[in-house]
Amino acid sequence: MAAFSSSSSAPMLIRSVLFVSLLSAAFVFDSGEAGAAHRVVDPEWHPATATWYGSADGDGSDGGACGYGTLVDVVPMKTRVGAVSPVLFKGGEGCGACYKVRCLDASICSRRAVTVIVTDECPGGVCAFGRTHFDLSGAAFARLAVAGHGGQLQNRGEISVVYRRTACKYGGKNIAFHVNEGSTTFWLSLLVEFEDGDGDIGSMQLKQANSAQWQDMKHIWGATWSLTPGPLVGPFSVRLTTLTTRQTLSAQDVIPKNWTPKATYTSRLNFA
C-alpha cells in the first residue's frame, strides 16, 4: 500500500515543481546583453527598450509633441525629458507622466534608475508595432551607465531596460497654466505645466466669472486643452482630474480677467 501511495503522488509532485519553476521564471527578465538574466523583484517594473537622440550630452527634444516648448530646455525638465512610443504617449494623455528607467547589463549599467518626464512621442521605427520604448536625451541615457561608461552605453544604440511609473516632483513649483498663442474670448487654449504626482491629465474643466457651472474642456493635442463656446469672461477657475488615479484639484480664479495669450499663470497649489 505504501508503494502505491508513493507512486500515485509522484505526478502531483512533478506538477508542483513545474508550477514553482514557471512562477519563478515569470519574475526574470532576460536583458539579452552579455548573456545575463536579471531578476526584477518588484512587480511594478516592466520590460521595455531604450535609445537616445540628439547630442551625447544634450537635453533632448526641443519642444516636442506635448507642446511644452522651451520648458524642456530648462530646470526642472532639463535633461530629464524623453519621447515615448504610442503605448505610453496615449494620444497625448500620457504627456507629463514620470517614469523611472533602469538598464539591465550589470557589467555597465548603474543600479540606480533615471527619472524621465514624457514630453514627446516617437511614433515610428523602434517605437512602432505596439512596442514599449523610451527615446531619451543623450544626457539621461548616459546616466543609465556606471560613472565613466556613459559613452560606451551610448555606443550600443538600442538597449533593454525596465521601467515603472513614479510620482512627478517639481521641487516646490505649483501648477501653472500657459495660455496658448491664438487664444481669444471665443477660443481658449491652455497648456498645463509642473503637475506633481500623476503628471497626466484625464479631464479638465473651466469655470467663468460669476458662474457656478464647470464647463468641460476638450483635449486637442499633447498637453493642450481648449474651450470654444464664447464669449468667455474671466477670471477663470480651472479644475484638473488626473488620468491615472482620478485625483482632482481646483485652482480658483487662477487666470485673471485681463489675461493675454502667451502668458503663464501660476496657481497656489499642486497635487501632493
Swiss-Prot record:
Statement: the UniProt record of this protein carries the keyword Disulfide bond: yes
Annotated disulfide bonds: 66-95, 98-168, 103-109
Pfam families with a match to the protein in the record: DPBB_1, Expansin_C
Domain Expansin-like CBD: 186-267
Compartment(s) of residence: Secreted, Cell wall; Membrane
SMART domains assigned: DPBB_1
Highest taxon above the source species: Eukaryota
Domain Expansin-like EG45 stretches: 63-173
Recorded family membership: Belongs to the expansin family. Expansin B subfamily.
Function: May cause loosening and extension of plant cell walls by disrupting non-covalent bonding between cellulose microfibrils and matrix glucans. No enzymatic activity has been found. May be required for rapid internodal elongation in deepwater rice during submergence.
Protein name: Expansin-B16
